Amino acid sequence: MNVYQSLLQPFVFQTLRADPETVKLQLLRLGESIERHSDRPPARWIKQQLAQTFSLPTPELSQQLWGLTFPNPIGLAAGLDKDGVAAGLWGSFGFGFAEVGTVTYHPQPGNPRPRLFRLPADRAGINRMGFNNRGAAALAQTLEQAQKRSARTIPLGINLGKSKVTPLEEAVEDYLGSFRLLQAWGDYFVINVSSPNTPGLRSLQTAANLEPILSALQNENQARRPLLLKISPDLAWEDLATIIDLVKTYQWAGLIATNTTIARPELQTKVIPQTGKSPQEEAGGLSGAPLKQRSTEVIRFIHQQTGGQLPIIGVGGVFTAADAWEKIMAGATLIQVYTGWIYEGPGMVKQLLTGLQTELQQRGLDCLAALDRQP
């Protein structure tokens, strides 16, 4: 247990009983301030100190994928930095890539608060944020300004969602609008059709609704950016198989498995202090440790169905190097974290990388790319 887990995390989670969203926003404001002034000595020094503390050079874990170089396979999942305000900072925390968003074409406030809950006894979270963000145009401006200040050090993904005000039958144009505004600023793009917190969004995972989205975005993709689809862990296997076929048909770059779940497995948490309700009564997506097994099962299914030929970003319940390795062995090419990072603290990425190095050494492998994972 590190200093963050033994002192700071309990203070924030229990002593203050703070609204998790308030804490997150305060941290993002600090990150935004550092990022905005990163071309000046004080902020530049802070970034250097963060990198010295939390980064770990791991050339044996680097990956070449989609024409991009990932310094290591551990990335920040979408949802934390929705508006990209700290996009240039995440590499200093040791991440090998980062994903901003989810962003929508129209700015939107999201769902009413409280909408983010921590379940420490389960190492989990529930959120029903509802894609709160400043909009695609604002994100494009933010990323353009960041690019002028300093060169990007890690690949940046942009996660696109459908605006709540946009009818489902107009979803294609909504996604296209965001993609056109942001195409120049992302190294890869993710289409989110699997969040449980936008009414009707998950219905876009059906073949009839999904195919026009995949086709239109690939046709618009003149710069040939890698396009990925983020899927739900709650899909039936036959529905997932249909999605895999469509992704292959339209030559998309890969899948992100998985989003949060609407399932409520048996949890230790009985009452959420902010609302006085049980987790079963709270709407929203469940993330963290309870999602680990299901997300890994989905990763393994995709890997088997595609013969290991379709890249997968694995996300869901990663807290330790063993968790990350399990997903890699199931078929994940890259790994994302979010809830685990909140619980484990900023030193988590370094711990994961150290553990992954050990896994390679124990198997006598020189690099992660040499790993043989039979479908």
UniProtKB/Swiss-Prot annotation:
Membrane topology value: Peripheral membrane protein
Annotated positions binding substrate: 82, 127-131, 192, 197, 259-260
An example Gene Ontology biological process: 'de novo' pyrimidine nucleobase biosynthetic process
Compartment(s) where it occurs, according to its Swiss-Prot or TrEMBL record: Cell membrane
Cofactor note: Binds 1 FMN per subunit.
Keywords, sorted A to Z: Cell membrane, Flavoprotein, FMN, Membrane, Oxidoreductase, Pyrimidine biosynthesis
GO terms, molecular function: dihydroorotate dehydrogenase (quinone) activity
Keyword Chloroplast: no
Pathway(s) it belongs to: Pyrimidine metabolism; UMP biosynthesis via de novo pathway; orotate from (S)-dihydroorotate (quinone route): step 1/1
Cellular component, GO annotation: cytoplasm; plasma membrane
Family annotation (SUPFAM superfamilies): FMN-linked oxidoreductases
Catalysis: reaction(s): (S)-dihydroorotate + a quinone = orotate + a quinol
Keyword Flavoprotein in annotation: yes
PANTHER family in the cross-refs: DIHYDROOROTATE DEHYDROGENASE (QUINONE), MITOCHONDRIAL, DIHYDROOROTATE DEHYDROGENASE (QUINONE), MITOCHONDRIAL-RELATED
UniProt record similarity statement: Belongs to the dihydroorotate dehydrogenase family. Type 2 subfamily.
NCBIfam families linked: PRK05286.2-4, PRK05286.2-5, pyrD_sub2
Name of the protein this chain belongs to: Dihydroorotate dehydrogenase (quinone)
Annotated source species: Cyanothece sp. (strain PCC 7425 / ATCC 29141)
